[in-house]
């Protein structure tokens, strides 16, 4: 249990956002950011000075987990509000033709593109996606664009059906079929790229086991609880399998996400379960925590 300390508040959450330019500050040109222009923002607060920031990997910034935004002096990034103060370096302009419901996927898509890049999908690869939540579905969309045959492992029948409508070539119910055996039997070696989007350590172990020699296994999701899995060093040595992680969006992947959405290369609107005005925020949060919903959007 926890109490609520005065230092916890105010807190304005929300980091998957879309809005429009209301005003520009000193030193910012309206020619670059016209008033009323639609935009999204990468709201991860980074130091800009550490080794990773200087090498274009801002998602690994040493300060990224700082609990307070020192500049604004309040915790939280502020997307769940009418106004938000952002640095110009965080802003990405969007075409007016892009719907708000698609534009809010800029940040999660950017996270997934970072993961896809880590997976190094080649044309004709077999790709396994473990988990059929929002992030699993976005992995399906991106893997298909990369020219792969995509198989999803997901126990929920409705989510498996949705994955098929998004282009997934095959789906597995892991409660009925051993996903490791199924993937290996497809081509005799396993999947060249595996993306674990679930927080379950047993599934993380399956992800490693179904990865082909020379393949890439990407741990996209954090694990809860953070329970170690056993891996044979000799197997890793002889298979040359790569096990890696993917966390948050980089500047590079965020720009790519904006480009893909703006050009209509990715259509995430099937992943929106509901749109609520801000005066129905309570109903929105109650809908968001149900297991049968995907993204819930609150408008201001």
For each predicted feature, which ranges?
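Glycine-rich cofactor phosphate-binding loops and adjacent beta1-alpha1 units
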Residues: 119, 161, 166-242
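Residue-level marker of beta-strand positions
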Residues: 16, 37-38, 52, 83, ...
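C-terminal hydrophobic helical "lid"/dimerization subdomain
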Residues: 205-209, 250-300
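Residues in the short beta-alpha loop(s) of Rossmann-like NAD(P)-binding domains
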Residues: 156, 223, 249
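Short, well-ordered loop/turn sites that connect or cap secondary structure elements
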Residues: 31-34, 121, 211
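Glycine-rich beta-strand-centered segment in the early N-terminal region that forms part
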Residues: 5-54, 95-97
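Mid-domain Rossmann-like dinucleotide-binding core that forms the NAD(H)/NADP(H) cofactor-binding site
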Residues: 36, 95-176, 181
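NAD(P)H dinucleotide-binding glycine-rich loop of Rossmann-like/cofactor-binding domains
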Residues: 47-130
